[in-house]
């Protein structure tokens, strides 16, 4: 049993990127993923989980920051979607649904970083609700 949950509090492109990421991982090289994470220490994973809300992409896990791991895992997911090779009417594969995640990684800013930046401008909570 695996529970896959969608991301929330984000736009359409973000909502589609979560399931696409999961599908890409499942259709990708599961042995490569297993080889990678089987070496991870449980306590370090828990620590990263607890630190991530405070430190974001700067959180360390197994000697690398979460930005590194996000990029690495996104590349694995892309390979899985390319391997799956399911095309839309425009002959584009499902990797297009990962564009939002790629932008997050390229900009090195999470949705939380953007919200903090908006709030920090004038400390007005209404800024957080404007889209």
Regions found by a protein language model. Give the residues of each.
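C-terminal accessory/tail domains of diverse enzymes
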Residues: 1-131
């Amino acid at each position: 049993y695996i529970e896959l949950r969608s991301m929330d509090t984000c736009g359409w492109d973000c909502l589609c990127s979560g399931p696409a990421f999961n599908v890409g991982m499942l259709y990708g090289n599961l042995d490569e993923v297993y080889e990678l994470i089987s070496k991870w220490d449980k306590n370090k994973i828990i620590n990263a989980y607890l630190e991530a809300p405070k430190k974001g992409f700067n959180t360390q896990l197994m000697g690398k920051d979460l930005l590194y791991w996000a990029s690495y895992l996104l590349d694995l997911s892309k390979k899985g979607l390319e391997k799956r090779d399911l095309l839309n009417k425009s002959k584009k594969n499902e990797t297009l649904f990962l564009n939002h995640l790629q932008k997050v990684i390229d900009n090195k800013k999470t949705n939380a970083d953007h919200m903090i930046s908006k709030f920090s401008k004038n400390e007005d909570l209404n800024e957080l609700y404007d889209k």
